[in-house]
Amino acid sequence: MSKPALRVAVTGAAGQIGYALLFRIASGEMLGKDQPVILQLLEIPDEKAQKALKGVIMELEDCAFPLLHEVTAHSDPRTAFKDADVALLVGARPRGPGMERKDLLSVNAQIFTAQGRALNDVASRNVKVLVVGNPANTNAYIAMKSAPDLPAKNFTAMLRLDHNRALSQLSAKSGKRVADIEKLIVWGNHSPTMYPDFRFATVGGQGLTQLINDDAWNRDTFIPTVGKRGAAIIEARGLSSAASAANAAIDHVRDWVLGSNGKWVTMGIPSDGSYGIPEGIIYGFPVVTENGEYKMIKDLEIDAFSRERLDFTLKELLEERDGVKDLLK
């Protein structure tokens, strides 16, 4: 007997990331090859965006995905999020020319306040929310604060792209396969201040620091390369990373729903006060996932360099939080 379909809401559905994401969700890559889905797609009310969304839906229909039971187009989050089991908040206002970061925060605060309220009112009480649109951590924080009737743990931000980027760099440096590297962490904000940390990472049971014992490379090459990878892709491609971002979103939700099989993964989650990170801040932490729940890896040793990096990325998150505080009243 087939499973009941899960409702997946996606915002910014006609955008670059949306286009790279939707077909993979509909094929079963995110929720399982035996899990039917209903896609509820949100775009801004603008006529051009809605027309583009219609075109994407035509293509989804033309794929004749066996698992895609229904797809609907929306311009109002209150209909798009109705009974949603999973919500991927991809759409966000990008930073325009001459736009200060505080302006970006303010515009996105309005978007994510409205979306948080809509989730609060109409989504499933167990909805799993992943914020992809930047600034992802703070946008997730805004949505969470705007949805007081939903558990805070339902709101997450995407650091999986940074995690995957870091894995790729470590693989290239060590000569080991990406799939064999375990226990990597990316701490903090999804921004260049993040801290990719391979002090606990292993390859086939061996500590990765034994293979890469190079503090200068870690500090001067690895950390900045991971932090600035998005900018490097824009420089090379003329467009921001869309396929890799969509891939990371699928990884994040797949592991959250289906489990990470004991492997550590990075998720931006509300802090419980661990590692000196104030409670409620959405921060990248190492987690394992099973049975639809994530569990933070606790009590890892934080050396002096790591403490400095954790505090550096926290400072940025606190500044962002303070920048939107007045908008959350």
From Swiss-Prot:
Reactions the enzyme catalyzes: (S)-malate + NAD(+) = oxaloacetate + NADH + H(+)
Active site: 190
Annotated GO biological process: malate metabolic process; tricarboxylic acid cycle
Keyword Nuclease carried by entry: no
Domain of life: Bacteria
Function: Catalyzes the reversible oxidation of malate to oxaloacetate.
Family label: Belongs to the LDH/MDH superfamily. MDH type 2 family.
PANTHER family per UniProt: MALATE DEHYDROGENASE
Protein name per the record: Malate dehydrogenase
Gene: mdh
